[in-house]
A protein has these predicted regions:
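N-terminal nucleophile
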Residues: 1-243
Length: 243
């Protein structure tokens, strides 16, 4: 299982993903689910993947290969003219991989499903954020929906819905995502550390902050402990129910 979140902030884009994959309680591995491509001064693009590991690895490999040796120079992550075209390229590649794997196997296409979050900025345009579905179609983040999640979303979603503000700083947004991930980690063993973090600041066209947060990270554990304590204190302060 996977948990990925991307926030569209006034100051840029923030991405976070876990790294755990599992095929049962006795077969747990760590795989990167966040990938970044950049051309300094021109573009930064980040992709996060959730779903069938073979599918997502094939998609990332194809996108990489076609960026190096493009059949159509405009149809690569490093040359697409807009982020919309980037999202369409990712969707087409995902659909291609799913159809190819289904044709070679004996099971339904849904077995090979995956969902992808793609965001970034190309010079001359605003940062954009998309959620790509297994069918290859996609939606874009907006003022009404300024964040996307993929994978095991239900445990960490209420925290983001209550506290997220696009005007918040990167520091506060990272704290918010740490709380969201902490809630998910405690509720679902299929989501696990380390976490990958990428903060892209608007109009810099540089990769920005990229960090792996290990399971023994002291700041993450401080956030987890302080959040748990603050939640208990908040519950104590709520009015009592009359019985």
């Amino acid at each position: 299982m996977t948990y990925c979140v991307a926030l569209r902030l006034d100051k840029g884009l923030l991405f976070m993903s876990d790294t755990r994959t599992n095929a049962g309680v006795d077969n747990i591995s760590t795989f990167r689910k966040m990938f970044t491509w950049s051309v300094e001064g021109d573009r930064v693009i980040t992709i996060m993947t959730a779903g069938n590991l073979a599918t997502t690895q094939a998609v990332i490999s194809l996108l990489d290969e076609r960026s190096v040796i493009p059949a159509d120079r405009k149809q690569t992550l490093l040359a697409a003219p807009t982020m919309f075209q980037v999202a369409r390229l990712v969707g087409d590649t995902l659909k291609e991989v799913i159809h190819s794997q289904a044709a070679e196997g004996q099971t339904a296409e849904s077995t090979f499903g995956a969902t992808i979050i793609v965001g970034g900025q190309i010079r001359g345009m605003e940062p954009r954020l998309f959620l790509v579905y297994p069918e290859g179609n996609f939606i874009e983040a907006s003022d009404e929906t300024p964040f996307f999640q993929a994978g095991e979303t239900k445990y960490g979603r209420p925290i983001i819905l209550r506290a997220f503000d696009p005007a918040m700083s990167f520091e506060d947004a990272i704290k918010l995502l740490f709380v969201s991930f902490d809630s998910t980690l405690k509720a679902n063993l299929a989501v696990g550390m380390p976490l990958d973090l990428h903060a892209y600041r608007i109009d810099t066209f540089e990769t920005g902050i990229q960090r792996r947060v290990p399971s023994d990270d002291p700041y993450f554990h401080a956030i987890s402990s302080d959040w748990g304590r603050a939640l208990k204190e908040a519950i104590d302060k709520l009015p009592d129910f009359s019985v």
